[in-house]
Amino acid sequence: WAYKKNLAMSISGSVPCSLVSRVFNCKPYTLIDDPQAVTYSTIANLSYKSFCMLYKVPDTYKLHPKSIVLKSLKEWAYLAPSVFTPNISVLADYAITPHRYLFVREVSVGTSNYASQTADSILQIAKLIPSDMPVLLSLEKKDKYKEYPQNWILLQEPLQDVHSLIYYSAGLISSGDSMAREASLLGVPSYYLGIRYSMPANAVAAEVGSLDNQQTMSIEKWIEKTLSLQENKPLLQEEVRASINEKFVDIHAYMYNLVTQHQQ
């Protein structure tokens, strides 16, 4: 794709793109959010500049000299108020009421990201959720659906607007950390059932929003607390979103300015 093209810069988060950019004398900028990743040092070495998309980095972490902390999380690029507008009409397909249902996500542990994680984390805590509470179930291994409570609503994915379903939920429980972070940035109380407790991005999402895990609060207490906040959730949600928007940089404006600098 780069052959015989006059490219001034590239933006990616991968080793191959950065390597190709170097070959074609193009300045590679990279975006990463996990300085624990095995590819982090390689990506940073190949970069002209590497943006570490974390609101803050723990003192125990030593970043690469080319790394610049960008005060945001990557999910904010598509969840910021200037970009994402929740659509309440998506709830009609499921006959659910705003802030009166839970969204749960069960990831497959067959991938490299979750290889060391216990399988069926959501299934193991399903009985703790009140039987009269509507639940939307996002399930990667859909062949296991019959093992979950039959009154739970199985989502037929991919969905056109999954983030609106998360936004209007009373809370989200996920065995994967990506969707737990998304919920937190949407101002939705979230609970992460996985094991990546020390990942900086998860710590940031917990600090600026509401993300708990098995080390910070029991799932029983979280369910009780979340259900007790249903009445006040819309107001609290907007306060959280506004607070995050003040703390995080505008990623789109930042990247636009970066690109225009190379056009001058």
Placement of each model-derived feature along the sequence:
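Donor nucleotide-activated moiety binding/catalytic core segment of transferases
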Residues: 1, 142-179
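Active-site and donor-binding regions of nucleotide-sugar-utilizing enzymes
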Residues: 1-63
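A donor-sugar binding/catalytic signature common to diverse glycosyltransferases
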Residues: 9-20, 28-32, 164-202
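Short, polar loop motifs at secondary-structure junctions
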Residues: 13-16, 53-59, 138-146, 196-198
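A nucleotide-sugar donor-handling region in carbohydrate enzymes
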Residues: 49-117
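Catalytic donor nucleotide-activated moiety binding site of glycosyltransferases and closely related
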Residues: 104, 126-156
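Catalytic binding pocket for nucleotide-activated donors in carbohydrate/polymer assembly enzymes
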Residues: 185-230
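C-terminal amphipathic helix plus adjacent low-complexity
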Residues: 232-264
